[in-house]
Amino acid sequence: MTRLSFTVLIFLAAYFGSNIRPNVATLDPKTVCYYESWVHWRQGDGKMDPEDIDTSLCSHIVYSYFGIDASSHEIKLLDQYLMITLHDMEHFTKHKGNAKAMIAVGGASMSDQFSKTAAVEHYRETFVVSTIDLMTKYGFDGVMIDWSGMQAKDSDNFVKLLDKFDEKFAQTSFVMGVTLPATIASYDNYNIPAISNYVDFMNVLTLDYDGPWAYTVGHASALPEQLKTLEAYNKRGAPRHKMVMAVPFFARTWILEKMDKQDVGDKASGPGPKGQFTQTPGFLSYNELCVQIQAETNAFSITRDHDNTAIYAVYVHDNHAEWISFEDRHTLGDKARNITEQGYGGMSVYTLSNEDVHGVCGDKNPLLHAINSNYFRGIVTEPTVVTVTPVTHTTEHVTDIPGVFHCHQEGFFRDKTYCAKYYECKKGDFGLEQTVHHCPNHSQAFDEVSRTCVDHAKIPGC
């Protein structure tokens, strides 16, 4: 690749919109799998090692995280004993299979150091060269730059840093990626047209739109919000095929303020309790949650949005209720199909250690399988049910709270207080699940006999 001056390069990128980076990444949908090295130190089913990664389900596996040395500005190992003495990095690249093995540099605590390193030409050179040396020595195929919290004042220096990587990557097959935030206030801190021309893909952190830091409950990663973020970057110059959408393999949890107030937007008193492995208030890995649901099915009420792109559970125990926003194989499969149909580049998963990699709840890696199986063959979304065939009724006990609907058997049931609202109850992965539907017109009522929406005057009490 012919080198151009930085100024001319940026001009040509903006004017022609051409790709500066060689196209070394696959054009097929990507599944970018983040692996946190520190999960080696967990116990029991929470522990994970590189050998536990099913690389056939990942196009890229990302070893997280590396830092930057404050004195030398070289790439920094954050756990030398694990990474070198225990040969963890070598195990990671040895077991990569056909996936691209990458390193992630940065994270939430590295913004200030990135700012200092990227501001000086000599520091940029040192950091990039040391990164390439490490990747070459241990068999990595590329790097993800995760400059979390970058400020507008650093925008030009970020592009200069990517330009330095581009210079040193010339005539190599190294993969270059960056991570972008989902916060609206941060969008314009990034020179998206310039960045797009330097990278093979952009990992957009479409996570945590709601969480226990806010004292109201809500879907942590609802698809409409995720799509708004992707569209915002697309309007700023990011090609759709270069963006991968981050999805959580974890749940966000709250303690409800009132046990009978369980809808999206209702108040919470704080975060849910720590999980057995993750040990973080308001946070559960999927493998922690699925074990809990299977062990106490009767204490959980699971509600799925009518479009199948969001799901939550309410867990009633010890005189309080937890509200849990999570993903399952159905929501993730729908998201995978939806975004690839729109031309986006795939998904990144946060993180492999949160997946059921050991198969403690059933088959191994159910979430990864759902994502990959839906990239290439579409699943027809079921329309809102107006007429349905008779169903087989099965009865299960669910902890009841006065004034709150719970599924006790499969079927369709009208809400007791709002006749245009009705519930579909059917078997899911974790027992009975309910999906909330509404009649097209608020003056209608749902008729449980005909299973259609009719004029409310035809239904006694409506």
Curated annotation (Swiss-Prot):
The entry sums up its family as follows: Belongs to the glycosyl hydrolase 18 family. Chitinase class II subfamily.
Glyco sites are at N338, N441
Q: What is this protein called?
A: Chitinase-like mite allergen Der p 18.0101
Where does the entry say this protein is expressed, by tissue?
Expressed in the peritrophic matrix of the midgut, and only very weakly in fecal pellets.
Q: What is one process in the GO biological process aspect for this record?
A: carbohydrate metabolic process
Domain Chitin-binding type-2: start-end pairs:
404-462
Question: Major place of localization?
Answer: secreted
- Assigned GO CC terms: extracellular region
